[in-house]
Amino acid sequence: MFPKLRFKEFDGDWTLTTLNQLSTKIGDGIHATPKYDESGTIPFINGNNLVNGRIAINENTKRISSEEFQKYNQILSDRTLFLSINGTIGNLAFYKNEKVLLGKSVCFINLKNDLDKKFIYLLLQSPQLTKTLNSELTGTTIKNLSLATVRNLEFYCPIEAEQTKIASFLSAVDEKISQLTKKHELLSQYKQGMMQKLFSQQLRFKADDGSEFREWEEKELKDIAEINPKSKKLPESFIYIDLESVEKGQLLLQKNIELQDAPSRAQRLLAKGDVLFQMVRPYQQNNYYFNLSGEYVASTGYAQIRTKLDSKFIYYALHEKTFLDEVMNRCTGTSYPAINSSDLSSIEILIPCLEEQTKIANVLSAIDQKIEVISKQIEQAKQWKKGLLQQMFI
């Protein structure tokens, strides 16, 4: 057996083996709860801390003291890979001698020396093995992958030289994705910085003739926009936008449905320039600026905002921190905080003249366009990698 896509200098069949045969030890973290210490320096990690090949520590990561850490014997080395096996399944990370304590949702795989560690890391991402692992999951609410399944995982493996060649090639693809992701993060940070400067009026534009624009005026949202305008009769068929359809300003899902099959929440008939504001969990900021042709209807989970001002400026103003903080202050509920249309409409916004609105909207739109281009490049690179993983492994 050998893969569809192969470097020409290699031939011969790959060998069927198991992960256990290629490892010195496979185990998981502690099943007990350690004694947490807010002033502790050692992170207690779980599967969610395994991100894109590294251990990612965040503000929610529990910590323990050095004394607590000494109670547990973890046999890890530079030959160790981590795999998440409980709750979050399939996350991977290299161990780089960080001082961390493993929770039970982290499986450690100590590989033998005659293997390319990066090859095994990539192999475990392949569609073939991902499908196999997912088929072996147990549990209903919280999924679990047993250590026995991990140990007995079967796959075909080439000689070490071919492993290294494959790993080197695919690592270059990963590096490209990483560079694009970093660029995306930096542009997103730049946009946030620009929004802060623009909406705090730290940065002001001038009119085309060089004159100063008038001072901004404070107005309630309902005074500058119509909230949830009454819709005419809905069309017999339309594209439905619900709360799952939009993520960070991007329309990801377009569901074409018939009126007779439409959910009761399908009520907001959209017109170009409308802004959709997410009223449930608004901190997610999955709002949408609608500028498409055709029949679209949105869920009542959104507030539909229609204005005669620059609607793109209003869209950005709804993402400004001061506005969002006020929205959250008026929300009710804990797990799913929500604001009603009446409370939303009474929140005040600082409004410049129309010409300055347009200048601000144009600057932020230009940044968004660059971010979208990079997002598409990242997605294309990920799809390319997925195709390579499909063809370069058995």
Cite the ranges covered by each PLM segment.
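Short amphipathic coiled-coil heptad-repeat segments
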Residues: 1-11, 172, 177-218, 373-394
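Short, surface-exposed secondary-structure boundary micro-motifs
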Residues: 87, 169, 281, 363-365
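Non-catalytic DNA-recognition/assembly elements of restriction-modification systems
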Residues: 4-29, 152, 207-231, 346, ...
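Sequence-specific dsDNA recognition surfaces
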Residues: 20-33, 48-78, 222-233, 242-272
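Short coil/turn segments at secondary-structure boundaries
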Residues: 32-39, 59, 136, 234-240, ...
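A short glycine-rich beta-alpha junction/loop motif
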Residues: 3, 85, 100-107, 130, ...
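A short beta-sheet element
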Residues: 46-47, 57-127, 264-324, 338
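A generic structural signal for residues embedded in beta-strands
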Residues: 83-84, 172, 178, 277-278, ...
